[in-house]
Amino acid sequence: MDLILVDTRLEGREKQLGGKDTTGKTAVDTAVWKSSGRTLLGLEQQQWLLEQLQQSKATWKILANQVMMMQVEAQALGLATNLDAWDGYPAEREKIYTFLQSKGIKNLVVLTGDIHCSWAANLTFNPFDSTKYSRLTGEGSLAVEFVTPSISSANIDELLNVKGR
């Protein structure tokens, strides 16, 4: 097993997008949001990560980072897109996914915290496109991600006063 740790909070990171429109809703310039130049890792760390993934001979590659990599269909949940996570840097995430696919890198597990609840998902270019990814079989998945809840801060169910399922 190879353990790869990256910093998605301070080193090389471009400030997350945000701001409000005249109605108080989060306003995002879509062209800036989807820009191929926006980076969460910074170019040096991004290159280092890709090298680590490609050079690894381990069966399992574990990537630990601070923010959720999976895509979230936030609007369907009545939430804003989390621009402070990989959803705020979609072009860079896609570059990593393209690299995984083109190099045939298998058995990548992403471990994440920060979101104050537990999540698990297959990582794929578009988890909502059933022609390229099967939620039933996982076909089309490039990696998996496990997100842990908070230890000492309030978790999302407590913050939103939502009962678990």
Which positions does each model-derived feature cover?
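Long, structured stretches of catalytic cores involved in phosphate-ester chemistry, encompassing
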Residues: 1-165
